[in-house]
Amino acid sequence: MKNTASTTAAAGWRDYYELCKPRVVALMMLTAVVGMLLASDQGMPWNALILGNLGIALLASSAAAINHIVDQKIDAVMARTQKRPIVQGRVDNVHALTFAFSLAVVGMAILAWGVNPLTAWLTLASLIGYAVVYTLFLKRATPQNIVLGGLAGAAPPLLGWTSVTGTVDPHALLLVLIIFAWTPPHFWALAVHRKDEYAKAGVPMLPVTHGDRYTKLHILLYTLMLFAASMLPFITGMCGWIYFVAALALGVRFLDWAWAMWRDSRKHAAIKTFRYSITYLMLLFVALLADHYIPVTLS
C-alpha cells in the first residue's frame, strides 16, 4: 500500500509539472536571465534575480497550462501530444484551470510587489498574448498564426531587462526582435515535419494551407531576416567581437539548414532544422553573456 500511494502521488506531481511545459519555459527563462544580466552593470539586484525569475516562470507556466486546456482536442489527434495529462484524463479541466490561475496570481503578486509594476504588467500581457490571443484565436484562424502571435513568446528578455531597470530599453527590444524573427522558421520546420498531424487536427499551419514548397521558401526568408537581426547587437555597439563571431557562425549554420530544406538535399531536414533552431537560440544567448563578461579588444 505504501508503494502504491507513493507512486500515485509522484504521478500526480509529474502531471502538473508537465502542464507547465518545463523545457519550453526553461528556454524562455534562459533568455530572461540574459536580459537581466545584460541590463545590470553594477551587479544583479537580488529581487530581480530571485523574485523576477520566479514571477516570470510562474506566469509562463500558467500560460502553458492554459494552452493544455484550450488545445486538448488538437492534442488528442496529434501523436506528439496524445499523452499529455489532460488528454489522458489524469488532470481535469477544473483542476488544470485552478492550477493555471493560482500560478498567475502568485506570479503577478511576486512581480508587482517584489520587482516592479512594469514587469508585472508586461508579463501578464505576454501571458494573454500567448494563452488567449494566439492559442484561442490565431492558431485556429490563420496560417500566419506563428508570425502574429510570436511577439508574446519573444518577450522574456525584455521582461528580464525591465525587472532590473524598470524601463523599456532599446537594447532589450533588439533581443525581442531576434526571438521574433527566430519563431517562424523554428515552428514552421516542425510544422513541415508534422504536416499530416496538423491537417488531421484542423490547424491551418502554413504547410497545410500553402504546401511544403511555399513554407520552405518562407523558412529560408525568415532565416535570412533572423541572420540580419542577429547582427544588430554588434552593429549598434551593444555587443562586441565574441558575440559577432558566434552569431555569424550560428547564423551561417542555420542558413545552411534552411537552404537544405529548400533544396530537399538532406534526409529529415525539417526535424533537424527544428532541433538546430533550439540549439541556435540557446548558444546565441550564451554568446551574449560571454561577450558581456569577457573583454575583447581588437587593435
Curated annotation (Swiss-Prot):
GO MF term (any one): protoheme IX farnesyltransferase activity
PROSITE patterns, per database record: UBIA
Record Gene3D superfamilies: UbiA prenyltransferase
Alphabetically ordered keywords of this record: Cell inner membrane, Cell membrane, Heme biosynthesis, Membrane, Transferase, Transmembrane, Transmembrane helix
Alphabetical list of Pfam families matching this protein: UbiA (PF01040)
Catalyses which reaction(s): heme b + (2E,6E)-farnesyl diphosphate + H2O = Fe(II)-heme o + diphosphate
Gene Ontology biological-process annotations: heme O biosynthetic process
InterPro entries with a match to the protein in the record: Protohaem_IX_farnesylTrfase, UbiA_prenyltransferase, UbiA_prenylTrfase_CS, UbiA_sf
TM regions (residue ranges): 24-44, 46-66, 94-114, 118-138, 146-166, 172-192, 232-252, 278-298
Record's GO cellular component terms: plasma membrane
Membrane topology value: Multi-pass membrane protein
Pathway: Porphyrin-containing compound metabolism; heme O biosynthesis; heme O from protoheme: step 1/1
EC nos: 2.5.1.141
Protein's cellular compartments: Cell inner membrane
Miscellaneous field: Carbon 2 of the heme B porphyrin ring is defined according to the Fischer nomenclature.
Family per record: Belongs to the UbiA prenyltransferase family. Protoheme IX farnesyltransferase subfamily.
Alphabetical list of PANTHER family matching this protein: 4-HYDROXYBENZOATE SOLANESYLTRANSFERASE (PTHR43448:SF7), PROTOHEME IX FARNESYLTRANSFERASE, MITOCHONDRIAL (PTHR43448)
Function: Converts heme B (protoheme IX) to heme O by substitution of the vinyl group on carbon 2 of heme B porphyrin ring with a hydroxyethyl farnesyl side group.
UniProt protein name: Protoheme IX farnesyltransferase
Protein species of origin: Hahella chejuensis (strain KCTC 2396)
Lineage of source species: Bacteria, Pseudomonadati, Pseudomonadota, Gammaproteobacteria, Oceanospirillales
